[in-house]
């Protein structure tokens, strides 16, 4: 693998992208970078968790990303959300995030959908067409519905639980849903599934 920033990676990557991801390429190699670049990713929620997730994805080489969120930027978002600054207050979050991501990689395909995921419109998102589904929704009913649907697909599925009012980042862990502890949101979701006598498919 060449260490020259402009050396050919693939016809799929623009010359600019080859320069942007040069250091990532040195770290993970051509094959992994191609896999990352080919992923079709959909992210639900671009608030305090999802907005930073979106930026990390694009900086890591994800080039096809759909953003879904119905909210507009509020002044109270400024302390913790990537799209929130005083000048962006009142603007549609997914549009602000899209602009930010295209400033990072102008050649990326970033789709912004100003909508809320819910049972009534769930079918419109065609989850089976994505390789990765990320849940950063903070409303219980919509989150539960997305978990049930996403776990029925072949996609890699990641769901963010709750970290509100928590101060120790060293205690954040990645765990199987039924094993998550110390999280009121995860507990509420498990109780909701038990009451409904349904369970997400294990991934």
Protein language model features and the residues they cover:
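Hydrophobic/small residue at the entry helix of a nucleotide-binding pocket
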Residues: 49
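Glycine-rich phosphate-binding loop and adjoining beta1-alpha1-beta2 segment
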Residues: 62, 67-105
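N-terminal charged helix/coil linker that caps or initiates catalytic domains
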Residues: 1-42
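Conserved SAM/SAH-binding loop
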Residues: 113-122
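Conserved N-terminal Rossmann-fold NAD(P)-binding element of oxidoreductases
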Residues: 43-45, 68
């Amino acid at each position: 693998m060449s260490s020259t920033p402009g050396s050919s990676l693939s016809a799929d990557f623009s010359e600019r992208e080859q320069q942007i991801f040069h250091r990532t390429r040195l770290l993970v190699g051509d094959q992994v970078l191609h896999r990352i670049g080919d992923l079709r990713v959909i992210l639900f929620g671009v608030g305090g968790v999802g907005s930073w997730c979106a930026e990390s994805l694009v900086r890591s080489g994800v080039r096809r990303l759909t953003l879904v969120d119905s909210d507009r930027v509020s002044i109270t978002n400024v302390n913790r959300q990537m799209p929130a600054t005083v000048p962006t207050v009142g603007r549609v979050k997914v549009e602000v995030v899209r602009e930010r991501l295209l400033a990072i990689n102008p050649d990326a395909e970033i789709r912004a959908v100003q909508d809320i995921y819910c049972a009534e419109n769930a079918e419109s998102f065609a989850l089976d067409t994505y390789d990765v589904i990320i849940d950063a929704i903070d409303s219980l009913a919509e989150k539960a519905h997305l978990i049930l649907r996403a776990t029925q697909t072949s996609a890699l599925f990641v769901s963010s639980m709750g970290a509100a009012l928590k101060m120790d980042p060293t205690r954040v862990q990645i765990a199987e849903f039924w094993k998550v502890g110390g999280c009121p949101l995860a507990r509420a979701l498990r109780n909701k599934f038990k009451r409904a006598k349904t369970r997400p498919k294990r991934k």
